[in-house]
Each structure stands twice: as structure tokens, then as C-alpha cells.
UniProtKB/Swiss-Prot annotation:
EC class (word): translocase
Family: Belongs to the complex I subunit 4L family.
Bilayer topology annotation: Multi-pass membrane protein
Functional note: NDH-1 shuttles electrons from NADH, via FMN and iron-sulfur (Fe-S) centers, to quinones in the respiratory chain. The immediate electron acceptor for the enzyme in this species is believed to be ubiquinone. Couples the redox reaction to proton translocation (for every two electrons transferred, four hydrogen ions are translocated across the cytoplasmic membrane), and thus conserves the redox energy in a proton gradient.
Membrane-spanning ranges: 4-24, 30-50, 62-82
Quaternary structure annotation from Swiss-Prot or TrEMBL: NDH-1 is composed of 14 different subunits. Subunits NuoA, H, J, K, L, M, N constitute the membrane sector of the complex.
Location in the cell: Cell inner membrane
Protein name as catalogued: NADH-quinone oxidoreductase subunit K
Entry keywords, A to Z: Cell inner membrane, Cell membrane, Membrane, NAD, Quinone, Translocase, Transmembrane, Transmembrane helix, Transport, Ubiquinone
């Protein structure tokens, strides 16, 4: 059986990998978006671990709401990314940081 410590280590490892993805690759918007989604997944693993440990289903229900918001965030982020690529022909963060008025 998987203990609480194992799940917390898994959540911490996923969170650290996502932080490394954000800090080490600041050029590609797709990698940044995937790193943020991985960070939300790490938080969900911790919610489920504590919910299972305490025997309360509120944490598991909260995870469903987080997954719904994360799916909407990913859809909106990818739609913005497609529009950005069509107008600027790049997804490099360094090249699209200037706003045009």
C-alpha cells in the first residue's frame, strides 16, 4: 500500500520538476504552459493524499474543481497561443513581450 509519505514525495518531485521547467526554459510558451499544468497536478496529488489520509472526500471533490479550471485554463492558453502564432509567427516569449498600441 502506498503511504502518505510516498505520495507527498511524488507531489514534491512533480512540483520541483515544474519549477525547473519554468525557470530553465523561459523562451517557449508551450513549455511554460505545460509546467504550470504539471504544478497544478502536483497540488492535486497532495490534495488527494491528505484527503485519503484523513478519510475526508472534500479534498477529492476539490481536485475535480481544480481539474475543471485547469482544463479551461489550458484551452484558453492554447487559443491565445494559436492567435499569437498566427499574428507574430513565433511562440518565443522574448519576441512577443512588446505590446503594440
Amino acid at each position: 500500500m502506498i503511504s502518505l509519505g510516498h505520495l507527498l514525495v511524488l507531489g514534491a518531485a512533480l512540483f520541483c520538476i515544474s519549477l525547473a521547467g519554468i525557470f530553465l526554459n523561459r523562451k517557449n510558451v508551450i513549455v511554460l504552459l505545460m509546467s504550470i499544468e504539471l504544478m497544478l497536478l502536483a497540488v492535486n496529488v497532495n490534495f488527494i493524499a491528505f484527503s485519503r489520509q484523513l478519510g475526508d472526500t472534500a479534498g477529492q471533490l476539490f481536485v475535480f474543481f481544480i481539474l475543471t479550471v485547469a482544463a479551461a485554463e489550458a484551452a484558453i492558453g492554447l487559443a491565445i497561443l494559436v492567435t499569437l502564432f498566427r499574428t507574430r509567427h513565433t511562440i518565443n516569449v522574448a519576441e512577443v513581450d512588446a505590446l503594440k498600441g
